[in-house]
Each structure stands twice: as structure tokens, then as C-alpha cells.
């Protein structure tokens, strides 16, 4: 299946149903009074995280999701039916952005997590709500309010503990193949990896971590060279980055300059990502003897101004790989994920009169005589009825 990590969708919540203007009509009851019911609330639009999904490709074809409108109120104080909600399932790790405002509405990081992205409109009120001692035959009603309408940008960001960085052909895919059951394509040409991939590294029965492999970066990636830097977003949730350096590039390039290019592209993309813990890992040490590899790695680290620990490995022959993985596991255990504050579910808001509507009702006080005749031929199309509009 094609990997798609960005999509745009339109969500439209249901409008609220209108209130009804109606009067009780029954034999031997000449003055039945108002019995117009309220409308129903409009349906909401929800997003739900599903761990069984791993791409947004479905939303390249289906881009519009609309909740059901609330039904209008009816006579005999019958309330309109509430509109049905719509639930849109997205992969775990999806970030939701409102295109109109640029606001991040939420991150779907847990299976089953739900996020309301479109609130249905409020119901309108029927004329029975307006009856009073001075207005026994009200012809007022309120219309339902429109539901929310939004254009949403969905961005899938992989959930991994460890992210891998490096130039093309640095050995990232070979490394993930050697430590996990993932089988990304490996070949002797640049940009063999075209889409991100995940691998689970199991250290024992209880300890494991997830590593993410993304396509390689080259100089000018921030300006669109190569595959660009858009895949770097998949590393934003990683706790540590492994910067793989080919200790002896086959193309004769300078390893120090290659490392600086990666750091520069990271800084151009995001200061936050550039500030993440980053470990230096020299790969392909099996191509030279141990002493030469150690001397070369030391020279490269000094030229970079690197003062922290670095690792020498061979992903192909798994030299030094196990020790590196155990150190990564220890780091992950010592630095657990900080639990983000769970999004609070919006509370159900009951309709409340505001000052404007109270004032309007007070101004509508009309004296009604006991012998006043009821309008027996009235129906909902009567143009003399008054409609009240309210806002949330």
C-alpha cells in the first residue's frame, strides 16, 4: 500500500433543527394552547485514532465528511431527532491542523483516542417555550444554528523511540534490518529508501523499543534537493536520534562535511528537533582494521568538535550493534515519555437565554383577553409568525 502522510479533508457538522410553531387541536378543547416542539441538535464530527491504519491514502479520494442535520420540532411537543455523528478514523500519530486558523487541534497518539473537530448546531426552540401568563398563544420560534465547517490538514507522524539520520547510503536501512524484523529495501545506490519505515527492536521478553528509518538527507534538502526534509517530521516524537556516518564513503566525500550537512539541515527544519539528544554512530568499520577505524573516527569527531561519546559499528556484520542497542534501551528507560495532558471532552452545553433574548421577550408582552378567538386556520407557513435567532 502506498505510504501517504499528508491529506486535507473537509468536515461539516450538522445544523440544528428548527423549532416548531403549533397549537393543540382537539375536539371539545377550543383553546388547547401552544404545543410546538424543539428541534434536534446537529450531529458532531469526530476523529478517532486506529492502530490498524498506517497511511492517510484513503483521504486522497474521500475528502468530505458531513454529519446529519437535526430534525425540526413537531406538534404535540415532539422534539426533533438529533442528527447522527460521523466518526473519521485516522492512524495513530496523526496531527490535526485547522487550515483556516493554523491552529493545531490535537495529536492522535493513542489507540481509541477521540477528538471532536466539528460541533453540531444547537436546536431551535418551539413556541411552547414562549408561553407566559401574558402571551398564551405565542407564535415565536427559534431556528437551529449552523454546525461547524472546517478544512483540516492531517499530518501523519510516526511514533518511534529512536530516529535515524544520515546521508544516503550511510547504512540506515541495513542497521534497521540487522536489529529488527523490518525489511526495508537495501541497494548500492542513493535514495533506496523512499518512505519512512519502522522496526521493533526486542532486547528481551520485557524490553523493546521502536526505531524509525527515513530517507537520507543531502545538502540543500531544506530547499527541496533530493527528497527534501518533509520526512523529518516523523522524528519529532523520537526521544533520541542516531546520526549514522559512513566512516569511509565510497564516493570519496568528506565524512566531516557530510555530518555538518545533516546538522545544518536539522537546524533549518526545526530548532526543537536539532536540540534533541543526538548520538554519533560511525558505520562500516568492517571495511578497515580496528585501529584504523578508531583513529579515523577520533579524527572526525575532533574535527566536528564532538565531545560526547560516539560508537563504532558495522550494521552489515553486526559489530558493536548489540552494545549500541543496550545503551539506547537504557537511555529510553531513564527518559520515559512525558505524558501529555489528555484533551478534555467538551461538556454538553444546555441552552440558556442571554440578555438580548430576555429583553426581546419582555418587549413582546401582549395582553390577551379571555374571550379572544384562537387562530384556528394557522399553520407553519403563516407569515405573521416571529422567528428568534440565538447564538452560542
From Swiss-Prot:
Residues that, per the record, bind Mg(2+): 173, 193
- GO function terms (MF aspect): GTP binding; GTPase activity; magnesium ion binding
User: Ranges for the OBG-type G domain?
Assistant: 160-333
Main enzyme class: hydrolase
Where is it localised? Cytoplasm
Q: Does the keyword GTP-binding apply?
A: yes
The coenzyme or cofactor needed here is: Mg(2+)
**UniProt feature, compositional bias: Polar residues:** 129-143
* Residues the entry annotates as binding GTP: 166-173, 191-195, 213-216, 283-286, 314-316
PROSITE patterns listed in its UniProt record:
G_OBG, GTP1_OBG, OBG
Report keywords, A-Z.
Cytoplasm, GTP-binding, Hydrolase, Magnesium, Metal-binding, Nucleotide-binding
* Record-linked InterPro entries: G_OBG, GTP-bd, GTP-bd_Obg/CgtA, GTP1-OBG_CS, GTP1_OBG_dom, GTP1_OBG_dom_sf, OBG_GTPase, P-loop_NTPase
Nucleotide-binding: is it a keyword of this entry? yes
Q: Can you cite a GO biological process for this protein?
A: ribosome biogenesis
Skewed-composition ranges (Acidic residues): 363-386
Query: What does this protein's UniProt record list under function?
Result: An essential GTPase which binds GTP, GDP and possibly (p)ppGpp with moderate affinity, with high nucleotide exchange rates and a fairly low GTP hydrolysis rate. Plays a role in control of the cell cycle, stress response, ribosome biogenesis and in those bacteria that undergo differentiation, in morphogenesis control.
Name of the protein in question: GTPase Obg
Record the organism. Answer: Enterobacter sp. (strain 638)
The root-end lineage is: Bacteria, Pseudomonadati, Pseudomonadota, Gammaproteobacteria, Enterobacterales
Gene encoding this chain?
obg
Amino acid at each position: 500500500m502506498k505510504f501517504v502522510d499528508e491529506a486535507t479533508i473537509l468536515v461539516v457538522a450538522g445544523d440544528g433543527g428548527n423549532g416548531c410553531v403549533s397549537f393543540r387541536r382537539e375536539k371539545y378543547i377550543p383553546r388547547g394552547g401552544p404545543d410546538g416542539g424543539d428541534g434536534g441538535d446537529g450531529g458532531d464530527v469526530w476523529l478517532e485514532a486506529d492502530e490498524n491504519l498506517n497511511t492517510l491514502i484513503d483521504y486522497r479520494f474521500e475528502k468530505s465528511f458531513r454529519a446529519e442535520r437535526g430534525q425540526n420540532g413537531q406538534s404535540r411537543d415532539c422534539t426533533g431527532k438529533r442528527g447522527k455523528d460521523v466518526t473519521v478514523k485516522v492512524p495513530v500519530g496523526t496531527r490535526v491542523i485547522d487550515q483556516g486558523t493554523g491552529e493545531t487541534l490535537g495529536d492522535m497518539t493513542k489507540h481509541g483516542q477521540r477528538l471532536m473537530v466539528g460541533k453540531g448546531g444547537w436546536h431551535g426552540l418551539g413556541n411552547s417555550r414562549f408561553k407566559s401568563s401574558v402571551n398564551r398563544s405565542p407564535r415565536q420560534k427559534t431556528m437551529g444554528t449552523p454546525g461547524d465547517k472546517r478544512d483540516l490538514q492531517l499530518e501523519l507522524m510516526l511514533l518511534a523511540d529512536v530516529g535515524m539520520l544520515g546521508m544516503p547510503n550511510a547504512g540506515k536501512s541495513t542497521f534497521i534490518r540487522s536489529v529488527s524484523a523490518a525489511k526495508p529495501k537495501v541497494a548500492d545506490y542513493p535514495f533506496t529508501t523512499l518512505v519512512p519505515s519502522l522496526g521493533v527492536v526486542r532486547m528481551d521478553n520485557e524490553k523493546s523499543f521502536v526505531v524509525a528509518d527515513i530517507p537520507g538527507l543531502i545538502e540543500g534538502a531544506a530547499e527541496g534537493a533530493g527528497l527534501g526534509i518533509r520526512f523529518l517530521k516523523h522524528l519529532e516524537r523520537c526521544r533520541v536520534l542516531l546520526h549514522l556516518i559512513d566512516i569511509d564513503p565510497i564516493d570519496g566525500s568528506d565524512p566531516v562535511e557530510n555530518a555538518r550537512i545533516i546538522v545544518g539541515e536539522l537546524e533549518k527544519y526545526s530548532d526543537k528537533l536539532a536540540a534533541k539528544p543526538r548520538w554519533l554512530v560511525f558505520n562500516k568499520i568492517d571495511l578497515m582494521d580496528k585501529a584504523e577505524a578508531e583513529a579515523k573516527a577520533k579524527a572526525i569527531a575532533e574535527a566536528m568538535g564532538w565531545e560526547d561519546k560516539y560508537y563504532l559499528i558495522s550494521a552489515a556484520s553486526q559489530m558493536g550493534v548489540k552494545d549500541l542497542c543496550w545503551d539506547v534501551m537504557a537511555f529510553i528507560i531513564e527518559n520515559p515519555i512525558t505524558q501529555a495532558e489528555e484533551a478534555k471532552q467538551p461538556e454538553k452545553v444546555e441552552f440558556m437565554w442571554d440578555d438580548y433574548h430576555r429583553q426581546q421577550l419582555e418587549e413582546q408582552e401582549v395582553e390577551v383577553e379571555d374571550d379572544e378567538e384562537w387562530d384556528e386556520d394557522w399553520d407553519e407557513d403563516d407569515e405573521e409568525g416571529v422567528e428568534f435567532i440565538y447564538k452560542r
